Amino acid sequence: MHITQESDYAIRIIYCLAKNQKRMDARSISQEMSVSLRFSLKILGKLVASGLVASFKGNRGGYELARPAAEITMLDVIRAVEGPYQLSRCLEECGECNRGASGICAFQQVFRRISEQVNRELGAVDFAQIVASENQCR
């Protein structure tokens, strides 16, 4: 099981902005993170709409983090591009049980517990930590 490519790229884009600590244009972000410009712009639009990234128009335009990297978690980024993380569709409000059951079953209880644990872990990792650990690896 993997996160989507869009979430992977969104995490890279936020990392790029956190690491560089400056306003960057979409083309530079795209090149530095090896993400196509078109896909970068789509993701940046979602990140701006979610309030994680600020965009600026004009000569000195570009993108920068809307708040400090220490206040942006991996969970924030995944939610911005995909919505809430849930291991199984059966956890959604209108999720349909693929076996036709109604109510809560043993599988749903397990999927909910795992989803909550993954969300806690993703919410515990912020981009200041990631940048700091990357700097220690050099």
Q: Which residues fall in each region the model found?
A:
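Alpha-helical residues within the helix-turn-helix
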Residues: 31, 48-49
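Non-DNA-binding regulatory cores of transcription-related proteins
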Residues: 66-138
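Key DNA-contact positions within bacterial/archaeal DNA-binding proteins
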Residues: 38
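Beta-hairpin "wing" of winged helix-turn-helix
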Residues: 51-66
